[in-house]
Regions:
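Structural motif of enzymes handling amino- and sulfur-group chemistry
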Residues: 84-163, 167, 171, 178
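Active-site PLP attachment segment
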Residues: 43, 47-98, 102-106
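A common structural junction motif
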Residues: 87-88, 177-186, 239-243
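Single conserved hydrophobic/aromatic residue that forms the stacking wall/gate
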Residues: 1-10
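PLP-dependent enzyme catalytic core of the Aspartate aminotransferase-like
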Residues: 14, 165-169, 176, 192-243
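Catalytic PLP-binding core of fold-type I/II PLP enzymes
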Residues: 11-49
């Protein structure tokens, strides 16, 4: 799976992971939420089970709590289905309708947010208050070769960056000055959202553990939505000046 915090892609070639799992008779499960079936098809690459948060990019409007899990093996699929029905995990008809509605526009939303995200990542790379930027299609991305092999030209909509001033105080100033961008540990909405892994998704780790992962107090994750790129850069320009 792609990394929730860093937005980096597969650290090892998936073909190697598939071979290892087959050798050890282990089922390979891939979380495809960040990349979606539009950019990557795990089963075609050898995965046995795929999970995806429909709440995020697929439905795309932050108004459903839904996900799916599907397996290659029909017996495994039957076990999953029986468990869901037995434990009452079936979603409401209304949520299913909302998700189906979102799927109608998913291809358009994906292409638009991905295109904006790439331009946005390049903009951040030139900002004097930003120390580093992680986006899969940037040539300086640590996993650039694996990205091209796994995702082709797709970079998807997630951008991560780190402030030059890596203190919590600078991070707080930045967030307070960033108007019109929701501060929320979610992703995939039509509106751009910002999250701070050190105080949200990775808050349960020690500081040393976070630093090992490359997550400092100045590290942020952006889920790029459907706004015009000029609107995003203007807002981030103003906020970054306060760091």
């Amino acid at each position: 799976s792609t990394s929730r915090g860093l937005g980096d892609v597969y650290k090892r070639q998936i073909s190697g992971i598939v071979s290892l799992c087959q050798e050890k008779d282990i089922k390979l499960l891939v979380d495809n939420t960040f990349t979606t079936p539009k950019a990557f098809k795990p089963m075609s690459a050898g995965a046995d089970i795929v999970v995806n948060s429909v709440t995020k990019l697929l439905a795309g409007h932050s108004d459903v709590t839904l996900g799916y899990v599907v397996a290659k093996d029909k017996t495994v699929n039957k076990s999953i289905y029986d468990f869901v029905v037995t434990t009452g995990l079936t979603p409401s008809p209304y949520e299913c309708w909302l998700a189906e509605r979102g799927l109608m526009t998913f291809p358009l939303r994906f292409e638009s947010s991905q295109a904006t995200a790439e331009v946005f990542a390049k903009y951040l790379s030139t900002n004097k208050n930003v120390d580093r930027v992680l986006y899969p299609t940037l040539t300086n991305h640590p996993d650039a070769a694996l990205v091209k092999q796994s995702l082709g030209s797709n970079g998807c909509n997630m951008v991560s960056f780190e402030l030059k001033n890596k203190t919590r105080e600078a991070a707080n100033r930045f967030v307070k000055q960033l108007e019109g961008i929701a501060f929320a540990p979610t992703l995939g909405d039509v509106g751009t959202t910002l999250s701070h892994p050190a105080s949200s998704s990775h808050r349960g780790l020690s500081e040393d553990e976070r630093l090992t992962l490359g997550i400092t107090e100045g590290f942020f994750r952006v889920s790029v939505g459907l706004e015009d790129i000029s609107s995003l850069t203007e807002k981030f320009d103003l906020a970054l000046k306060h760091t």
